[in-house]
Amino acid sequence: MPASVLAEIRFEPACLFQVVQGNLLEEPVEAIVNAANGMLAHGGGVAGILSRAAGPELQEESDRIVHERGPFPTGSAVVTTAGKLPFKGVIHAVGPRYGEGAEEEKLEQALRAAFACARERGWRSVSFPAVSSGIFAVPLEICSRAYLRSVRDAKLENVRLCLRDAPVVEAVLAEVARQGKA
């Protein structure tokens, strides 16, 4: 079932930001963003769902990258193939955990790094989940502000924030309304 578009904002130059409710694995984009940890161990949350759908090659490639380069710091992003998924790649954004400090800035940094990975590969459309809001427990108000600020300078044609859970949807839509752009 296609995602429901809940809000749209047009950022200059020509970036359409859409807040949608649906399944990240079915998004009509070139690449999706994964909510990752620094070890790229995709066991739980969005990462676990994505990894199981992609097949073992996604985790194997992630393990190889971490073995060669070491753990990734909070605020960074790295690209892997998408395995069995219908995307050109998966961008793994390492968001902050609540309590480590400067969560809002680190979350913005992780998403900006993810969008930069997409631009470097010539990808024009990406969809990202509610990074850091689940098992990393960053408060939804902080996440919502970071999501909107990071997209403003994404320099991509279409950026979609794909959400599932009602509390996250409500928090993001409230932030969109606060910014007066819905």
Where are these regions (language model features)?
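Glycine-/small-residue-enriched capping loops at alpha/beta junctions
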Residues: 2-120
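Polar low-complexity intrinsically disordered regions
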Residues: 1-3, 181-182
